[in-house]
Amino acid sequence: MSTQVKPGNWDTAAAITVNEICSQVEQMYSESEDVETQAGLNEEAIELEIENNFDVLVDILFHSEENKVEEALIEQIFFHIACLSMRGYSLNAEKTHGNSAAIIYDTVLGKQRMYGHGNIARFEIPGIAIRLNDKLERLKNLRRWDGPVLFEPMKDTWLDICGYSVIAIMWLREWFLLNLKNQETTGKPTGAK
C-alpha cells in the first residue's frame, strides 16, 4: 500500500494515492464470480463495512491508552475506507472505477486549491476523522430519508468520504504539505503577485 515513490508536488502525490486506490478497487471488484467479492456490490453493505472500519479508527485515535499510535494501521484503515467509498461512488454515480478516480482526483485537487494546507494542518488526522464522521452521518441520514436532503446527492457524500480518506493517506505519508504543481516555481499561490 505505502509507496516508495517521493512525489515532487501535491498534484502528483494526489494522483499516486488515487491511482493506488483505484487499482485496489479494480482488483477487489473485478469480474469475479466469488460470492465474497460480489457482496461489495451493494451500497448498504459498503456503508456498513466503512462504519465498522471507522469505529476501529475512532477507538485508535480517541480512546487508545497507548502513547504511540501505529500510523501504518491508521493508513491501512483510511486506505480501506477510500477503496470502499470509491466503490460506493462508482455504483451510485454509475461510473467506472477509472472515471470515478478521475473525478475524485479533480475534486481533491480543486479543494486543495480553494482551502490550502491550513484546514487540515491545524488538526491533522483527528480533524480529518471528525470531518469524515460528518460525511458518514450524512450518508446515514440520506439513506434514512431515501434521497437528497437539502440538495445533497448521495454520490457527493461518497465522493467526500473518499476525498477525506485520500487526504488522510497523503498526510500520513507526509505528502499533504507539498506545494501544488503551479506553486513549485514561485512558492506563491496562483494569482499571487
Regions found by a protein language model. Give the residues of each.
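Intrinsically disordered, low-complexity regulatory regions
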Residues: 2-193
